[in-house]
Swiss-Prot record:
It comes from the Bacteria. Pfam families: Copper-bind. This is Azurin. It comes from Alcaligenes sp. InterPro entries: Azurin (IPR014068), BlueCu_1 (IPR000923), BlueCu_1_BS (IPR028871), Cu-binding_ET (IPR050845), Cupredoxin (IPR008972). Disulfide bonds join C3-C26. GO terms for cellular component: periplasmic space.
Length: 129
């Protein structure tokens, strides 16, 4: 099984993937985030945040309040399963999480929590056999 994925977020506020599948056979899964754009992180920064679908809006709202210094993720937010830091154009970051944190049949969402981005920059993560 492929236990990692590469995803890019650009200056047009788009991820290049709308869906990520994670195999149950993976013990851990790694997300490699790349920003192929030119704009700085304080202007057009992107991160990759994973929550349950139902938790997305709350995590986004609290993340905005947390600010850029905290990567727009509330400190110790139990709803956030995994997240990268916020990166700007030309930068990369990765995050690895335990697949055991995912439950079969649950709906998971990934998104960028930079203010105003999640409406366009989001996708679905699925646990598969």
């Amino acid at each position: 099984a492929e236990c990692s994925v590469d995803i890019a977020g650009n200056d047009q506020m788009q991820f290049d993937k709308k869906e990520i599948t994670v195999s149950k056979s993976c013990k851990q899964f790694t997300v490699n985030l790349k920003h192929p754009g030119k704009l700085a992180k304080n202007v057009m920064g992107h991160n990759w945040v994973l929550t349950k679908q139902a938790d997305m809006q709350g995590a986004v709202n609290d993340g905005m309040a947390a600010g850029l210094d905290n990567n727009y993720v509330k400190k110790d937010d139990a709803r956030v399963i995994a997240h990268t830091k916020v990166i700007g154009g030309g930068e990369t970051d990765s995050v690895t999480f335990d697949v055991s944190k995912l439950a079969a049949g649950e709906d998971y969402a990934y998104f960028c929590s930079f203010p105003g981005h999640f409406a366009l920059m989001k996708g679905v993560l699925k646990l598969v056999d």
